Amino acid sequence: MPELPEVELTRRRLERELTGKRIDRVVVRTPKLRFPIPQELHVSLPGRTVRSVGRRGKYLLFDCETGWLIVHLGMTGFLRLVAGTAPPGKHDHLDIVFADGTVLRFHDPRKFGTVAWTTDAPATHPLLAAIGPEPLTATFDGAYLFAVTRTRRVAVKQLLMNAAIVAGVGNIYANEALFRAGIRPDRPASSLGRPECERLARTVREVLQESIDQGSTYRVEEETVAYHPLNFDVYGRGTDACTRCGGALEEIRLGNRSTVFCPRCQT
């Protein structure tokens, strides 16, 4: 699943390539993904110019003069820039065709992605209104994390993956941040002390920023997108040896998600 770094890299590429371009038409091949694709796109988008591409959590926000196109890539989705002559594939559900012939194509095999349209401020849209602070901003720090964990006994990893607590932290980077912070993922969030919250807020920022930095060669137009450029310490490593102590990692399920940690290094 594309997480915050992958969405941010997509945003940067699309803003660089699409800002200032005028939309000619919209082609919808699959009327319903996670939710129905708004019919008004056929009327609202043609003739409009992309002014910027923003991001809120894992959502991409296209400023199209009179409104905002909101896109979530879901579990398997990605956006490609292709030539207008490129034939669509089986899972290419939406094309936004620009006046210069460029096509922004939404590919999503599992159809869990979302496309929405709003003429109001994006922050007020139901998809975005309840999202928590961005983890790479000053509003997400140890003091904030300490405050929101006081009454929550849910596992700390599940708390990190709750978009209402912090935006855009998924399974991959929650695993990695907790390892760096030395905190077991299944610990009740309320058991964390202030120093642990400070440490965890810092490692969340570190793993996200490092992944963005290492993904500088990410290319949104490639069909086989190389997500997750970070060299992982625990994610996807099952019972391999810990990169820090050499002991065996453990794999458990939390919230129906695979969770890997080191029982020696994380307490």
Swiss-Prot record:
Catalysed reaction, written as an equation: Hydrolysis of DNA containing ring-opened 7-methylguanine residues, releasing 2,6-diamino-4-hydroxy-5-(N-methyl)formamidopyrimidine; 2'-deoxyribonucleotide-(2'-deoxyribose 5'-phosphate)-2'-deoxyribonucleotide-DNA = a 3'-end 2'-deoxyribonucleotide-(2,3-dehydro-2,3-deoxyribose 5'-phosphate)-DNA + a 5'-end 5'-phospho-2'-deoxyribonucleoside-DNA + H(+)
Ranges in coiled-coil conformation: none
InterPro entries, per the entry: DNA_glyclase/AP_lyase_DNA-bd, DNA_glyclase_Znf_dom_DNA_BS, Formamido-pyr_DNA_Glyclase, FPG_cat, MutM-like_N-ter, Ribosomal_uS13-like_H2TH, Znf_DNA_glyclase/AP_lyase, Znf_FPG/IleRS
Gene Ontology process terms (BP): base-excision repair
EC number: 3.2.2.23, 4.2.99.18
Cofactor note: Binds 1 zinc ion per subunit.
Cofactor: Zn(2+)
Enzyme active site: P2, E3, K58, R257
ZnF locations on chain (FPG-type): 233-267
Superkingdom, natural source: Bacteria
Family: Belongs to the FPG family.
Complexes and interactors: Monomer.
Protein task: Involved in base excision repair of DNA damaged by oxidation or by mutagenic agents. Acts as a DNA glycosylase that recognizes and removes damaged bases. Has a preference for oxidized purines, such as 7,8-dihydro-8-oxoguanine (8-oxoG). Has AP (apurinic/apyrimidinic) lyase activity and introduces nicks in the DNA strand. Cleaves the DNA backbone by beta-delta elimination to generate a single-strand break at the site of the removed base with both 3'- and 5'-phosphates.
This protein's name: Formamidopyrimidine-DNA glycosylase
Native source organism of the sequence: Geobacter metallireducens (strain ATCC 53774 / DSM 7210 / GS-15)
